[in-house]
């Protein structure tokens, strides 16, 4: 228990926040700057934009922002060679024979037929 409290205290005292982002290699990633007067620490091309945003080219990179209050925001970009959603084939939507709607309609027709046949025999 003391070890957990000690580790929690160390984590709070370090005041370092981590941000992870996945992207497609070669595209541009738009991120929000964590603090307006932060210092950029990294070797990737950094393009500041309006509204406290910045753009980076997506490569596997590690960089950080050091804020004036002492908080350090560490970013990790993970570049993928292709997006998993780009080449997925859109399958046609087809109605199966035993879908719930079909079964409900079939049950209602069966019950109606049973009552009409029963009345005809009486």
Curated annotation (Swiss-Prot):
Signal peptide feature range: 1-15
Membrane-topology descriptor: Single-pass membrane protein; Single-pass type I membrane protein
GO BP, sorted A to Z: symbiont-mediated perturbation of host cell cycle G0/G1 transition checkpoint; symbiont-mediated perturbation of host cell cycle progression
Main localization of the protein described in the UniProt heading: virion
Keywords, alphabetical: Disulfide bond, G0/G1 host cell cycle checkpoint dysregulation by virus, Host endoplasmic reticulum, Host Golgi apparatus, Host membrane, Host-virus interaction, Membrane, Modulation of host cell cycle by virus, Signal, Transmembrane, Transmembrane helix, Virion
InterPro entries per record: ORF7a_SARS-CoV-like, ORF7a_SARS-CoV-like_X4e, ORF7a_sf_CoV
Subunit structure: Interacts with the spike glycoprotein, M protein, E protein and the accessory protein 3.
Protein name: Protein 7a
């Amino acid at each position: 228990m003391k070890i957990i409290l000690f580790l929690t205290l160390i984590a709070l005292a370090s005041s370092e926040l981590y941000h992870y982002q996945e992207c497609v290699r070669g595209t541009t990633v738009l991120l929000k700057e964590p603090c307006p007067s932060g210092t950029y620490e990294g070797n990737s091309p950094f393009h500041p934009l309006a509204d406290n945003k910045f753009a980076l080219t997506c490569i596997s990179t590690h960089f950080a922002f050091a804020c004036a209050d002492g908080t350090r925001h560490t970013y990790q970009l993970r570049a993928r060679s292709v997006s998993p959603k780009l080449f997925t084939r859109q399958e046609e939507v087809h109605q199966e024979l035993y879908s719930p709607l079909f079964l409900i309609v079939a049950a209602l027709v069966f019950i109606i037929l049973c009552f009409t046949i029963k009345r005809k025999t009486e």
